[in-house]
Amino acid sequence: MAKSKSRGRRAEKKSKKEESSLVHDSEVPVQESGENSTPSGVPNTFFGLVDSNELDYFKQAESTLNINAFDSDEDRQGFINSVLEEAQGKELKLVTNQICSKLMERLILFANNKQLKKIFKQFSNHFVSLAFHKYSSHVLETLLVRSAALIEKELAQTEEEKHEEEEEGEDEKDDVPMEDLFISMLNEFKPHLTTMIDHSYASHVLRLLLLILAGKELPSTTTSNSTLRSKKSKIARKMIEIKDNEDFNRAFQTPESFKNELREYCQTISAGLDTKSARELSIHKIGSPVLQLLVQFEGLVDRERTFWHLIFCKDSEGKDSTEESFVEYLLSDSVGSHFLESIIKNDGARPKYLERLYKLYMKDRVLKLAKRSTNGVYIIQALLFKLKPVEVEFILDEIIPELSELISIAENQNLDLANKLIDASIIRGNYRRDEIIDQLFKKFAPNYNVENPQDHTTTEFIENILQLQGSTLGNTRDDWPTAEERKRALFLEKLMEYDYKFVICTWFNFMALPIERFIQMCFHGVFCHVVEKALIVEPEESKKVQILRKRLLNIFQGQIVGLACNSYGSHIVDTLWNFTVLLPMYKDRIASELFSESHKVKESTYGRLVWKNWGMELFSRKKYDWKALIKQQEVEYYGEDNEESTTSKRVKKPIELKLERLAEEKRRKEEQAEKAQSGYIKRKLDELTGSGPEKKQKLRGRNRN
């Protein structure tokens, strides 16, 4: 009731009085109010407003470039030339305007080398102001990436290419190498570096400068894990449909002078920091990513590792109470834990530095940190791949027995921890592999009998991991699969790759699902990959598993054509070709389904691909050749060229053993008959020629006489 009373006439009169007082108070020059609204040390240059008529023209130009409906690259370049001519002398006004800044960014992306240098020169002496501005900072980032690409191109030029360019640009007497222009810009920023670190817009420019100077990969401005832009900026960039060109997502060759510039940048920034301010920056939402890069790159130019020792004590020192409380804050804070994780993962520190922090402040409470699912657990995951083997095994010994308790299905916690444990175990020669498998089954399928699976197995395994209830599975509103569903599906695929027991368990769960529900999974954009990854066959397959494989294939009966004509299901039908190895009857059944509705299959884009991959032309015209493909597949599957070695790799079927017995008996009888026939013929010849053994003895006897 108190809130409703405050909305009466008295409140209105009071608000009017406050507004009038604000009006009187604000009757000061605009320039002064602008200066007072910005922090000290932050430039706030006003470059003017874009005229309304010009604004309409530039709006239209921006939409034309966005649509990109030019007949050729020459037409587009001609349009860009005309827009740049119109924008000449107005570049600074345009980049600080919300709409026109998008146009300038597109022009920079499409500009040739000469145009790029021209724009760069127009920004000269104003780079600092542009870096601190909301809109121009984004334009500046794009310009820096294109400039880095041009510097690499100029470094790679031969003398002949340079001479040709000089002849082409004889009219341009003041043509300066891009490297010199870039260094001139770097000098502009040096007095403002400490202010840039924690500024909302300038910090992103500083990050990019550090990446270029260090010769590291320049990340995309739209990907979710980009170190270049903030989350809001990446979303906005996608909405305005500005796409990066080929200069992004790659590293560039840099000149030797850049190493000196990086050293000066590091020295300038470190000179303005002490331990207290450095630690404050490491947990600062905006400054922390910049400090991460400084710690990561300082090793290129500073053997003393100044930034590291500003934040942490020297490696020769023991436990320090102040440092201990700071590390504890890092381990419990979201920004701080991300900072610590980043410098561990990105080789930002020497191994002995990390080992010191681990032994002093983390080793005796590994399990407790692993239970902090929003911060501490990420540090443990990073340490699994950076510490010595002995320490890694110690962490595994601590966590593996409690793995089932650490994973939370409902809250979707620590799936990444299970992933990293599996990877660390594999690297260490499958260290405690069986225990990891037992813990995962204990968590996700507690009622499943791993050694002797039963027909009454429920769907608990895939339900606990994929959370099918409440997912987008079966939705008719064309809902996109969520990021959580992708994460869960990838985790299940990882388990199936890790051990075949998870594949068998997944088969039983598929068979326990209603057929309609299973087919919905095959049509789902994420869960279809789970089905596809589950359709694998072991080389040495037992009879029991082969029977289970046949039972799983029965689910697909009558569904093949629908799957083949679907963008997701078609991949599953393709996978069934290998999944039906040694099961020619099932392979023939699937091919017959496709052939029975050949017109429908051939009318579909995806169906035609399935038709080709299954060799259906041979099936319909030359079935003998199609069966030869099946035989060839069996030989290739076992990786042997002869039937003897192939059959010795697996348990032979009773019919195969019987056929071999009959063949052996037939061969033995033929040999006996052949011997008998040859003996009979030989005796007859001896009788006719009189050259038997007895006559030879008589002759020998007569000769002696």
Curated annotation (Swiss-Prot):
Keyword Metal-binding: no
Primary site of residence: nucleus
GO CC annotations on file: 90S preribosome; nucleolus; preribosome, small subunit precursor; small-subunit processome
Biased composition (Basic and acidic residues): 15-27, 665-674
One Gene Ontology term from the biological process aspect of the record: endonucleolytic cleavage to generate mature 5'-end of SSU-rRNA from (SSU-rRNA, 5.8S rRNA, LSU-rRNA)
Ranges of compositional bias, category Polar residues: 33-43
Pfam families in UniProt: PUF_NOP9 (PF22493)
Gene3D superfamilies listed in its UniProt record: Leucine-rich Repeat Variant (1.25.10.10)
Biased composition (Basic residues): 1-14
Segments for region (Disordered): 1-43, 665-705
Role, per record: RNA-binding nucleolar protein required for pre-rRNA processing. Involved in production of 18S rRNA and assembly of small ribosomal subunit.
Protein name: Nucleolar protein 9
UniProt KW Glycoprotein keyword: no
Extent of the Pumilio repeats: 86-121, 122-157, 188-224, 272-308, 321-359, 361-397, 512-549, 554-592
Molecular function GO terms recorded: RNA binding
Protein family (similarity comment): Belongs to the NOP9 family.
Localization per record: Nucleus, Nucleolus
Top-level lineage group: Eukaryota
Taxon lineage: Eukaryota, Fungi, Dikarya, Ascomycota, Saccharomycotina
Keywords attached to this entry: Nucleus, Repeat, Ribosome biogenesis, rRNA processing
